[in-house]
Amino acid sequence: ESIVRPPPVEAKVEETPE
């Protein structure tokens, strides 16, 4: 199984903290 899926949105929270 070589299915590449995008990272979870929660991971982007670290880059863009509110």
UniProtKB/Swiss-Prot annotation:
This is Porflan. GO terms for molecular function: toxin activity. Disulfide bonds: none annotated. It is found in: Secreted. Keywords: Secreted, Toxin. The keyword Secreted applies. GO terms for biological process: positive regulation of cell adhesion; positive regulation of leukocyte migration. Expressed by the venom gland.
